[in-house]
């Protein structure tokens, strides 16, 4: 398989690095192939069609260049010295003739359904591929610090999606070493997060996540929790290993002046609270978020609440929160194909 370091800049653009790597691998034996919405085209950079050249996203290593054709497809032009124009044209049409339809995997956040996507788009590539604990310890610490610094800049929306690439170049120039990139892969069994809001993939590699140290897991989930707060402006942020639990007072609270009380719980405290039962209120819908050990099925709470069991794991709590907050489209990488 192609060395992921050679396609690190694809990760900075938010593309699924594993799918790109697999596509590049298959391209070695075929003139062109489409894998998960990423089309591989044999030919040199000079032969790239004009409409791709005008929308060039940036080089990814010595032999590959990425071009964005439209919001639903990305072409990667691989450089082969002996490629002819005919071979290149054949490769260009390969994906369209193969029966595979363009997939959103390459540009997973193409729809602006929530309106306030600019800030999220700028931050997601960095969060997905630098700050989730699968890279080097140095990269994790740096991204964690950067995330904390960014948490107070929610309203600015400044910066560019190219910032990650610049940071990488600066780091490489100073240290002489290429910054290690993290690979986030959707779980193989996506059915575990289906239903309620619909099928989706949470951007976790389950095996790597569960095999990583507890401190790494918690750091990853904390970063996602902060991302949720920025994205949805929710006061519903409850994670049981010591993060802040924001509990809205239900009685006599004006929507314009919400009253929130912050508590800090351990996982054991959280389980005790589950047994006792307590209620949180969704900031926007005002629907109750039911944390009740007597009910485990999300579908049993038609108002849109979350029902948890003391047997829930940290990850299952996270997934239920994501589904409840309606972030499945925001955080999903793709629907399985």
Curated annotation (Swiss-Prot):
Coiled coil: none annotated. Disulfide bonds: none annotated. Transmembrane segments: none annotated. This is Phosphoprotein. Residues 90-99, 172-182 have a biased composition (Basic and acidic residues). Phosphorylated by host kinases. Phosphorylation play an important role in facilitating trimerization and possibly P-L complex formation. GO terms for biological process: viral transcription. It is found in: Virion; Host cytoplasm. One of its GO terms (cellular component) is virion component. It comes from the Viruses. Keywords: Chaperone, Host cytoplasm, Phosphoprotein, Viral RNA replication, Viral transcription, Virion. Essential component of the RNA polymerase transcription and replication complex. Binds the viral ribonucleocapsid and positions the L polymerase on the template. May act as a chaperone for newly synthesized free N protein, so-called N(0). Plays a role in virion assembly. It comes from Tupaia virus (isolate Tupaia/Thailand/-/1986). Homotrimer. This trimer is stabilized by binding to the L protein. Binds N(0), and N in ribonucleocapsid. Residues 77-110, 136-194 are annotated as: Disordered.
């Amino acid at each position: 398989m192609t060395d992921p370091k050679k396609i690190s800049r694809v990760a900075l653009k938010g593309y699924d690095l594993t799918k790109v790597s697999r596509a590049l691998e298959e391209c070695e034996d075929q003139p062109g192939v489409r894998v998960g919405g990423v089309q591989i085209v044999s030919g040199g950079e000079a032969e790239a069609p004009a409409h791709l050249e005008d929308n060039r996203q940036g080089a990814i290593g010595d032999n590959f260049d990425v071009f964005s054709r439209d919001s639903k497809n990305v072409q990667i032009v691989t450089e082969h010295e002996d490629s002819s124009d005919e071979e290149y044209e054949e490769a260009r049409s390969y994906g369209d003739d193969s029966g595979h339809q363009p997939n959103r995997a390459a540009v997973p956040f193409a729809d602006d359904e929530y309106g306030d996507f600019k800030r999220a788009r700028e931050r997601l590539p960095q969060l997905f591929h630098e700050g989730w604990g699968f890279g080097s310890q140095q990269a994790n610490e740096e991204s964690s610090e950067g995330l904390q610094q960014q948490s107070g800049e929610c309203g600015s929306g400044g910066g560019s999606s190219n910032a990650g690439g610049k940071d990488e170049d600066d780091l490489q120039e100073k240290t002489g070493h290429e910054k290690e990139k993290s690979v986030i892969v959707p779980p193989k069994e996506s059915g575990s997060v289906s239903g309620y809001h619909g099928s989706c993939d949470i951007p976790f590699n389950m095996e790597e996540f569960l095999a990583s140290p507890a401190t790494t897991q918690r750091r990853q989930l904390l970063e996602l929790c902060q991302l949720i707060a920025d994205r949805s402006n929710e006061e519903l942020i409850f994670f049981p290993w010591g993060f802040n639990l924001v509990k809205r007072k239900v009685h006599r609270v004006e929507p314009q002046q919400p009253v929130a009380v912050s508590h800090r719980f351990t996982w054991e405290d959280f389980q005790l609270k589950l047994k006792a039962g307590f209620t949180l209120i969704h900031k926007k819908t005002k629907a109750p978020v039911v944390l009740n050990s007597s009910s485990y099925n999300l579908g049993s709470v038609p108002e849109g609440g979350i029902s948890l069991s003391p047997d829930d794991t940290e990850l299952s709590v996270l997934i239920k929160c994501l589904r409840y907050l309606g972030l499945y489209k925001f955080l999903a990488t793709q629907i399985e194909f």
